């Protein structure tokens, strides 16, 4: 299952502030050729800014360059994240799932 919008944005503070919504949703971090992490948050913008501040160094070590997102309410965003993770198999979601036993 593909993202609802194929548009990717550069992962930097200016781009996040300009494009990422403050609303609830799912987001994905990727490099040019691989998916690194797909998450969900009550604020897509806040979550992305936390990555840029180094809050999740195990994700940043893979050097994500772009982000994507979908605005969704809480229950839908959790289900959508699971679908996207299953489809894309992001590197850091596999590490998180295997080390914590949760998704």
Model-derived regions, located:
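Basic nucleic-acid-binding interfaces
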Residues: 58-74
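Short, glycine/polar-rich helix-capping loops at beta-to-alpha or helix-loop-helix junctions
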Residues: 52-56
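N-terminal cationic and glycine-rich segments that engage phosphates or anionic surfaces
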Residues: 99
């Amino acid at each position: 299952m593909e993202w609802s919008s194929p548009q990717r944005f550069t992962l930097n503070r200016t781009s996040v502030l300009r494009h990422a919504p403050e609303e609830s949703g799912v987001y994905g971090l990727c490099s040019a050729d691989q998916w690194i992490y797909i998450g969900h948050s009550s604020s897509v913008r806040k979550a992305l800014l936390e990555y840029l501040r180094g809050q999740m160094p195990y994700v940043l070590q893979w050097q994500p360059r772009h982000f994507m997102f979908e605005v969704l309410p809480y229950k839908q965003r959790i289900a959508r994240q699971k679908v996207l993770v299953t489809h894309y198999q992001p590197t850091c979601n596999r590490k998180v799932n295997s080390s914590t036993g949760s998704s």
